[in-house]
Design a protein with these regions (language model features):
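Hydrophobic/aromatic beta-strand elements that line small-molecule binding cavities or substrate pockets
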Residues: 15, 86-93, 120-129
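A short, structured loop/turn motif at beta-sheet edges
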Residues: 21-22, 45-48, 92-100, 126-135
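Short, solvent-exposed aromatic-acidic interface loops
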Residues: 103-110, 139-146
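Short beta-edge strand/loop motif at the mouth of beta-sheet-based domains
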Residues: 12, 32-86
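A conserved amphipathic terminal alpha-helix motif
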Residues: 142-176
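Amphipathic alpha-helical segments
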Residues: 18-37
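Hydrophobic pocket/interface hotspot
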Residues: 24, 34, 52, 91, ...
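Short acidic N-proximal helix/loop "leader" segments that mark the beginning
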Residues: 1-12
């Protein structure tokens, strides 16, 4: 895994997966498969313009999240532990076996996030066939629009989150 570009506005992760583009595409663009490696159960298929709702698999534990914040050197904050369904994302664009994107509130479980007013970030997945399998690039951008009091925390928590999710998708696809 490499991190080709990181700034204060953009997180980029890249990984080469030992699977054909068609397999990686299913893991990314099929809502059920996406949920399996990402840790959410989603309420339906990904459709451009549709807002997806999901529930966390397992327990979202405030103490564990605060501990993760400390390990990342992020100023700790309270956490809104979701009950029931939580808006996860609004699908932007789907280009089969090449590109998938959605918008969401970055680090949306932060107690200081205001879901009514918070600007969203754009999450993009780009797939490219390479000799070893598929190069997957994940970019999340738009952090400079996040309110200043949350920006650094949201960026660092999502930076750590994407590092973990790249490993999750690798294990999911390589093990399939």
């Amino acid at each position: 895994m490499t991190t080709p570009m990181t700034s204060t506005d953009r997180i980029e992760k890249q990984v080469t997966l030992r699977a054909p583009v068609s397999r990686v595409w299913r893991a990314i663009a099929d809502a059920q498969e996406f949920g399996r490696w990402f840790g959410f159960t989603l309420d339906g298929p990904f459709t451009p313009g549709k807002t997806m709702k999901g529930t966390f698999d397992g327990q979202v534990d405030e103490a564990a999240i605060i501990e993760a914040q400390k390990k990342m050197g992020v100023p700790t904050s309270g956490v809104k532990v979701p009950s029931g369904s939580t808006v996860l994302c609004t699908v932007e664009r789907i280009e089969p076996e090449r590109y998938f994107s959605f918008r969401w509130i970055p680090y949306g479980i932060d107690a200081e996030a205001d879901p009514e007013r918070e600007p969203t970030t754009l999450v993009e997945f780009t797939l490219e066939a390479v000799a070893e399998g598929t190069r997957l690039t994940i970019i999340e951008s738009g952090f400079d629009r996040v309110p200043a009091h949350r920006r650094a925390r949201a960026f660092r928590m999502n930076e750590g989150g994407w590092a973990a999710q790249v490993e999750n998708v690798r294990k999911y696809v390589d093990g399939a």
